[in-house]
């Protein structure tokens, strides 16, 4: 089964907790702190695997969680960090944040990797908090939570050439005779319901990847028929072969078909029309095909000014294997002078600070009032400090209180009208405000 979209949730591993320990050995009085740091949590990483062709692996397996780091140990030893969770994805996978819709990465190179959820750092052990004023601290940090996010995956197959056209114009037959691909072929519309990919080799030795895409109909750009499900796969192609049935066997007008398909391509993505097109006049072995082709050329020429260059037209018969060599040679020549089309600019990608730090202008905290009159503190930085505080140790709690004071939380609460004894809430944790 071909699957080109998927939704998954990923959760990186939590960092291991730091340890509170003291050196207790014979003949070593006042041994001091000896608790080590926790290990780093595993990150979740997507890696391109050329052997994959669809997102089928994500149909039933949609949740991925990396392991947490180990806790710090005595003798100042660090906990073992967890290995990263590597998830294989097919070449051509675009990854978006499901909540913001921002593109995180576009994975197109074999072996390319991208960290979609960063593992939490390990909490510091009490050996890290020793100072001349406090040589035996009973403070250790909890491990930092790993990142967690919902992702949308979209596969856009990598092909140099894309075959487009109405259903039953002979796209699958063309692919089957110029490559070793074996697409499903039938005498009815929408025989092809998934993209097919084949490698084409010309007589001069040039080779390129060709994709046979399901037939388009009017309204495809709005989702009619197979619509946008497969229009996305045209986006990575560099050259479009527009296949037209010149036999007009079903009473269709070849030129009207040509105009209709181009309108759908333009409506879906204006940049698709920047790609060079070759018109493939198929089924030329059928009666009246030559007359239809002549009429088509006249109608096409009427739409172009004298100084404009007309698209190349190649009369062929896929079934009779006629005209194929010249078509393939021309396609290879056009590919050689056509650069790749970038799907995304740098501005399209989510900024790195969303993963690895805080923006300079980011608010450290926010204060709101709950229905029960409690003061609610929130903010990514504040909440991160809170979850890394070991609430079982008085010194850790006092350290967190000093951090809040240093961030200006106490002063901000006073300005908002907080009084002695008011309830202050962070997540599910509550404490009394002391003025």
Curated annotation (Swiss-Prot):
It is found in: Cytoplasm. One of its GO terms (molecular function) is GTP binding. GTP binds at residues 165-172, 190-194, 212-215, 282-285, 317-319. Its main location: cytoplasm. PANTHER family: DEVELOPMENTALLY REGULATED GTP-BINDING PROTEIN-RELATED, MITOCHONDRIAL RIBOSOME-ASSOCIATED GTPASE 2. An essential GTPase which binds GTP, GDP and possibly (p)ppGpp with moderate affinity, with high nucleotide exchange rates and a fairly low GTP hydrolysis rate. Plays a role in control of the cell cycle, stress response, ribosome biogenesis and in those bacteria that undergo differentiation, in morphogenesis control. This is GTPase Obg. It comes from Streptococcus equi subsp. zooepidemicus (strain MGCS10565).
